[in-house]
Regions:
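Charge-rich, well-structured scaffold segments of protease-associated domains
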Residues: 1-100
């Protein structure tokens, strides 16, 4: 529940998104950003998102958990930390035990 990003904000820039300069051209990059670009460019991914959005418009299933690459660069490290602090907390979890 307490990832290193709280004391190492450079993790956000590496994992989330950042700018890179290649051959004089400035591009956006980052682990999550690139993964989501790939997911949003696959026909199967587009179809799945449209189906889920149509079937479950007012639920979390209508949203892509990794984020839309068009909007990922708008996310700031502080917004990410605020979201994490609010939702990724033990008080928001359930524990289920099953068996004999």
């Amino acid at each position: 529940f307490f990832p290193r990003i709280y004391d190492k904000p450079e993790i956000f820039r590496q994992e989330g998104w950042h700018y890179e300069l290649h051959d004089g051209k400035l591009t956006q990059s980052g682990v999550v950003f690139n993964e989501m670009k790939g997911a949003f460019s696959s026909p199967e991914g587009v179809l799945e998102r449209e189906i889920l959005n149509s079937l479950y418009p007012d639920t979390t299933y209508a949203n892509e958990s990794g984020g839309d690459p068009e909007f990922i660069p708008d996310l700031t490290c502080q917004q990410f930390l605020d979201f994490h602090g609010r939702y990724y907390h033990p008080s928001n979890s359930y524990i289920f035990l099953y068996g004999n």
